[in-house]
Amino acid sequence: GGPTDIAVLSLGGKVKATSVRVAGNHYDEEILKFVRNKYSVAIGQRTAEELKKNVACCPQKTDFHETMEIKGRSLLTGLPVRVNVSTDDLYEPVMMLSEQIGTAAHQVLEKTPPELAGDIFRNGVMLTGGGAQLHGLTEYLSEELKVEVTVSPDPVNCVALGTAMSLGLNDKLETGFLDATPRIGRR
């Protein structure tokens, strides 16, 4: 994943925007480091991603408490080991990154012209991308920003779908096929 882009859009254009170097893979890296430091266990990227998807949560969602048994290699003995990692264990690494997103979103809203405040209250904030699926992120951001935050119905694909729609490729999306033949030199 690349950066997290945050923008206020109005009348088909960008009013205010910023990017932060926080994305799904950054959560994975922080979880990887956490497991290494707390348990002295090396895990792979896939295991870190599974922890993010199934166990990690922002703290506002207090009814979400999961534990997952993971397998890795002990950094002390070099042997395979099993460790149980809980939602509470992942609080710090998850919140460190979520707070960066919340702060950046807050700054964008602060710089947004006041005449758009009504639209923001009415329409709220829409989360897109894979990171939008992090448990509790919508609740956390809603609390931080004081507006409703929702996740796109198809957060992983909506950016690509929106781009295709803006390029007038809607009909190709419906059939599921798009001619991606390079058009270099053609008129």
Regions found by a protein language model. Name each.
Residues 139-165, 173:
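Conserved phosphate-binding/catalytic loops in two-lobed NTP-binding clefts
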Residues 13-15, 117-123, 145-148:
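Short, surface-exposed connector motifs at secondary-structure boundaries
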Residues 117-141:
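Glycine-rich phosphate-binding loops at beta-strand->alpha-helix junctions
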Residues 74-81, 85-86, 105, 145, ...:
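PAZ/PAZ-like end-binding module
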Residues 44, 48, 165-187:
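Acidic, glycine/GT-rich loop-and beta-edge segments that sit at the periphery of enzyme/chaperone cores
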Residues 93-121, 166-169:
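Phosphate/ATP-binding catalytic cores across multiple sugar-kinase/actin-like superfamilies
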Residues 9-95:
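Phosphate-binding glycine-rich/basic clefts of nucleotide- and phosphate-handling proteins
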Residues 1-3, 9-13, 23-25, 31, ...:
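A short acidic Gly-Thr/Ser loop motif
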